[in-house]
């Protein structure tokens, strides 16, 4: 009986469905023939979203970038994070938008959220910097704050930058 349960669990986990890809939001590139294609630049192979996730799921670290003002890039980052969460435990998420002085706030907000106490203004509670459009970054940050893995600062503070 145990073997049947184990095989069933393995088969069901292999059939996990990726989150739906986000709808395109921005006007940029809408008439480009390659809009939405995922291309492996090493060999020009076109990948499906599932193939991309399968290739990335065993990576120890991923560096994912975006054009800071492109809503589609932000939506795809959140999609990729959620897709990878379905395939493996995440280690942590580091954001260049977070500076060392904000880490204590991030940790405090996370504890509050887990205790069921959501701040009225999440961006303000995190001391989110105005230069990073919260409307674009907020969905990813909000999602990450509710996960079991840490959300960490990856930027240097002003004093650290000035000392270089």
Model regions and ranges:
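C-terminal motif of bacterial Sec signal peptides marking the signal peptidase cleavage site
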Residues: 12-14
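N- or domain-start disorder-to-order transition segments that initiate the globular core
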Residues: 16-59
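Short, basic, glycine/proline-bearing loop/turn elements
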Residues: 31-38, 60-67, 119-127
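Short, flexible loop segments at the rims of nucleotide/cofactor-binding pockets, characterized by
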Residues: 37-44, 70-71, 128-131
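Zymogen propeptides
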Residues: 44-85
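A substrate-binding/cap region within the structured catalytic cores of diverse enzymes
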Residues: 92, 104-164
């Amino acid at each position: 009986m145990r073997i049947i349960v184990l095989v069933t669990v393995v088969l069901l986990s292999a059939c996990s469905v990726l989150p739906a890809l986000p709808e395109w939001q921005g006007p940029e590139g809408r008439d480009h023939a390659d809009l939405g294609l995922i291309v492996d630049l090493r060999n020009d192979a076109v990948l499906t979203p599932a193939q991309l996730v399968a290739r990335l799921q065993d990576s120890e670290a991923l560096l994912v970038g975006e054009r800071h003002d492109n809503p589609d890039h932000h939506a795809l980052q959140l999609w990729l994070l959620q897709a990878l969460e379905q395939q493996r435990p995440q280690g942590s998420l580091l954001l260049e938008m977070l500076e060392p002085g904000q880490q204590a706030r991030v940790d405090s907000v996370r504890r509050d959220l887990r205790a069921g106490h959501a701040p009225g203004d999440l961006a303000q509670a995190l001391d989110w910097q105005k230069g990073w459009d919260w409307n674009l970054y907020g969905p990813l940050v909000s999602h990450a704050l509710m996960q079991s893995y840490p959300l960490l600062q990856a930027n240097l503070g002003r004093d650290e930058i000035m000392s270089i």
